[in-house]
């Protein structure tokens, strides 16, 4: 009773849920083919399996009973195309542009959190140096306060997020980083 109500609710859903309806119904009705379904689910690519396509909606209920493991693979192929867009990790590649001339603008968070040396290297604090200090040891807090260099990918991204104003050489009176601005260990 509950299973038929669930199947009816899933069938009434939009077209996005239709592949899931086929997959759930076939898994429920074809209990003897669970081993085949598990082997298909565990594999990475489903493109080598060719199956007939269900064409009309009225025949959907009758065709669900006759589903084979190959047809569930077709459903998984359709769903696999949607997954990379959903599961992408968030990436900060924002560069602000002015509304008047369309020039790039500086992202202020970069200026506050990072220090750019004139050689193009970027300095930053280690992540978490201000967080949950009550449960960190003194040695760990000292290690977190240290400055580290950003890698090449991060440096290129930070250069895109800042304008040329922030890349010029500055001559501060008591600059503690004065000796680090120029690279002296490069062999020409």
From Swiss-Prot:
Localization per record: Mitochondrion
One Pfam family per UniProt: Ribosomal_L35p
A single BP term in Gene Ontology: translation
GO molecular-function terms, A-Z: structural constituent of ribosome
Gene3D superfamilies: 4.10.410.60
Disulfide bonds: none
Highest rank taxon of the organism: Eukaryota
Keyword line: Mitochondrion, Ribonucleoprotein, Ribosomal protein, Transit peptide
GO annotations of cellular component type: mitochondrial inner membrane; mitochondrion; ribonucleoprotein complex; ribosome
Similarity-based family: Belongs to the bacterial ribosomal protein bL35 family.
Protein name, UniProt field: Large ribosomal subunit protein bL35m
Organism: Bos taurus (Bovine)
Lineage start: Eukaryota, Metazoa, Chordata, Craniata, Vertebrata
Gene: MRPL35
């Amino acid at each position: 009773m509950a299973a038929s109500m669930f199947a009816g609710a899933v069938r009434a859903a939009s077209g996005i849920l239709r592949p899931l309806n086929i997959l759930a119904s076939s898994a429920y009705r074809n209990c003897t083919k669970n081993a085949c379904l598990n082997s298909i689910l565990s594999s990475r690519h489903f493109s080598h399996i060719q199956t007939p396509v269900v064409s009309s909606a009225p025949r959907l209920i009758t065709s669900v009973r006759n589903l084979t493991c190959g047809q569930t693979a077709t459903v998984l192929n359709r769903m696999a195309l949607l997954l990379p867009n959903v599961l992408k990790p968030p990436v900060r590649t924002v560069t602000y542009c002015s509304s008047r001339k369309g020039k790039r603008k500086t992202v202020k968070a970069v200026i506050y959190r990072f220090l750019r040396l004139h050689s193009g290297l970027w300095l930053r604090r280690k992540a978490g140096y201000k967080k949950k200090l009550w449960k960190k040891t003194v040695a760990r807090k000292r290690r977190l306060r240290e400055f580290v260099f950003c890698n090449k990918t991060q440096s290129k991204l930070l250069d895109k997020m800042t304008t040329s104003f922030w890349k010029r050489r500055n001559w501060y009176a008591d600059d503690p980083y004065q000796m680090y601005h120029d690279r002296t260990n490069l062999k020409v």
